[in-house]
Amino acid sequence: SDVLKKKNVFALSVNGDSMIDACIAHGDMVLMEPVSDSYSLRNGTIVSALVPGLGTTLKYFVKKGDKVYLEAANQNYDPIVLDSNQLIIQGRLLAVWRKV
């Protein structure tokens, strides 16, 4: 698969249901491509982000001015709103693996 040919791809285990409406469920494995420059991200990209006090989270990335909104795919979760310099975007979603 082309996904596995990309450099520095990493995997994360999903913990929780914040992205369930994007068909990403608790226990899934997500393959992520490292992001070196968050300015290259388009709004609506699913990213893993390191958020102070929360750890790593998987959310939709939305940038508005100097603010970044990390939005869940589950209406039970409020967006996480931060200044763009308050978080580290670790990677963008490439694929979801689920055991059946």
Language model feature labels by segment:
Residues D2-V100:
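Acidic/glycine-rich C-terminal interaction modules and beta/coil loop segments
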